[in-house]
Amino acid sequence: MATVHLPIRQLVEFLLRTGSIDSRFTGFDRALEGAHIHRKLQKAAGDGYQAEVFLSVERQAEDITFTLEGRADGIFTDETGTVVIDEIKTTAVPPEEITEDMNPCHWAQGMVYGAIYAAQQSLPELNVRLTYYQIDTDQIIRFIRRFTQQKLDEFLDKLLCQYAPWAQRRIEWDVKRTQSLSALQFPFAQYRPGQRAMAGEIYRACRAGKTADCKGGTRLFCQAPTGIGKTMSALFPALKAMGEGNGEKLFYLTARNTTQTAAEDALNRLHTAQPKLALRSVTLTAKEKVCLHPDAEGHPACLPELCPYANGYYDRIKDALTALLDGTGSFDRAALAGAAKRFSVCPFELGLDLSEWCDVVIGDYNYLFDPVVHLKRFFDSSGDWLFLVDEAHNLPDRARAMYSARFCKSSLTEAKRALGKGKSALKTALTKADKALLEARKACIQLAPRHSSQTDAADPAQTSLLPENTVPALELPEPLYAQDSTVFLQEPPSALLSPLRAVQAPLQDWLEANPDAEVHAQLLELYFAVQDITRAAERYDSHFVTQLTARGRELELQLLCLDPAPFVDASLAAGRSAALFSATLAPPSFYRSVLGCSDARAVALDSPFPAENLGLYCLPNISTRYRDREASVQAVSDALARLVQARAGNYFAFFPSYAYLRQVHEDFAARYPGIRTLVQESRLDDAARAEFLAQFVPDPAETLLGFGVMGGIFGEGVDLAGSRLIGCAIVGVGLPQVNPQQEMLRRYYDAQNGFGFDYAYRYPGMNKVLQAAGRVIRTPEDRGAVLLLDDRFAQQEYIRLFPPHWRHIRYLRSCEELAAVLQDFWNK
């Protein structure tokens, strides 16, 4: 008899949820502090009240064994001696509209818990109580119903019989999938050099899973240079492991849409090579990008009265799933949009619901790591998941951003202005919070006056609005670090967070009472900003610092996560294994440290391409340090000219900043007008990016030199194979800009391990260098030249970070020597 594991809440909601998607503001997140409210009510219930009681049972229905699990909010015995199952729900529904039958799912959940508990305790009957906590009034409304054990059993059996066809569908698919994956063959005639080694490492990690030594799951770092075929080298072995029962679902997590497409292409290749392959995949895309019915401003309008795809969604979704799951399929963005139109359902929610029935889920990092938007249906508890994390060199910065939060004083000032004249609880709360941040701004300027090297014209308010005899009413703690109107504190500033928390309740009340107000969107944005900063405060620990920055009349409050290691570690622990891979993961000690994988195995694979295909040169007589940049402009221009004049074709030059890029481009265009150039603008959408890259045509009639920024959208994740790109120059070692935040990061890691400069500057910089250089050689047939421009590339601190396939680098003395060696390279 087949066995199906089924969370009780999932059973109830799947069968009984009806109606529409409705994302109108209800303030429900204020109640979700729901967990806090639950604990508050549970504590108030007294000593005889058992809170969060774990219940599980095996029940048979339709020749299937169901393993049901869940947690009852509370179980107690009342004054009559009757056992009561308490189901607590927080709600923003007005008290007069809270009725006994307003949500059948609530009773159903309590009744299932009751059926399990009554059977285990041999109780002939018990009570189920619904406790509604109304978040606006703090009112508690309760409803009680008595059930016999027989009635509860009949109810549970009925639910299981209704779910049985869906369970049978899952069982049959799992058998078919396992058989199919066990016979899966590598889709190419042979492995590329290094590809089998990478596949073997990932296969072993997936098989190992959680062990006594790896309770958070097996972790693997794999540095695989361009050309190995990382995507297939990761997916194929993970799927083979799944076919052997090692992993229930595979999550392929990426930093960019381009790598999501690579994963889709790899899966399509497997389907093409093995047409009967039983494998379903879904690609999750941001709601804003897949919405079929946006509002006038282009934003999703997830309201039943505005969107036909939201209206009645839960009434139609099971029919849509039934039709879509009858075959094998790859549900990418286009397929989801087509299915959504066909069944008149929201494509974003359809993707989420399909993910529960798919074997491979492709999506952004945030679906696992972001504390707000992660997939709660999977990751609120651990599961038999396999994680493949592509472009893992991006994860440290992305993770820091996910766990940090930022709030601007101006949003309070603008909200007060938007509300107009008159008194209200909201305006009072906004005024208090605004005043607190104003005083913090004064204290910030006093603690960290702007240096004279900064122009007063750029920030006149630093002096004109703060007379010398001004004494801020708010006194900040002794700062960790203070410079140029930026102050870092170890502890979160309660004097600022408390008034911001006090804004939430009246702001919520206003939003609920004024859904059609012209400024509703503005105040809703403020609500979410306050919510973000207060949520970050709840996570705040020794891995965070507080940053206060005064700019003119503005004060920015940031709760900065300097070290995301414990949070990334906790996220990865939700699965059985995690393989993190990239072309640049050196040194491994750095990534182990910042990603919380101290015991992870790390492997570095050699490049599969012949070394002679890459001409690698360095002119170490040029300094591109910030203080030397103006003096270096002509030398850099001349070196770029020698690079591109050696052979007609497409080239890129990558710079550490837009300002330096523009300086050199202006000089280059003036002195070498015969060479066509393209300049990367600071903000390009997907269409503009594609248009830019389309200029890099195969075998061009004239030379093209693109000017781009290291670490930007062209510095990595771009595949210009063959003659679409035959060379690039890397101008500088890519160090992040020196600023107070980066300096705080350096100080933090200096205190942690003594490698502050490496962690904050050198390692991230060289990562960008290696990523940019990796754009040139994409296939075994490619030939190309890479030119490094900076004297630091000749220093041991940087040479030790070079990959093995850079051993043949040549250091040159002049542009004339560069021209000569390039001529030799291209003539071979």
Spans of model-derived segments:
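A contiguous, basic/glycine-rich beta-loop/short-helix subdomain that forms a polymer-engagement track
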Residues: 336-361, 371-378, 506-623, 631-634, ...
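Conserved pre-motif I regulatory segment
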Residues: 173-223
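Mg2+/Mn2+-dependent nuclease catalytic core
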Residues: 57-154
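A substrate-engagement module of RecA-like helicase motors
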Residues: 178, 185, 246-361, 369, ...
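Conserved helicase motor "Helicase C" RecA-like lobe of SF1/SF2 P-loop NTPases
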Residues: 656-681
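Signature of the SF2 helicase/ATPase Hel1-core->accessory helical subdomain module
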Residues: 234, 261, 341-360, 365-502, ...
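Conserved RecA-like P-loop NTPase helicase motor core
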Residues: 620-631, 682-793
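Metal-dependent nuclease catalytic cores that hydrolyze phosphodiester bonds in DNA/RNA
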Residues: 1-78, 82, 108
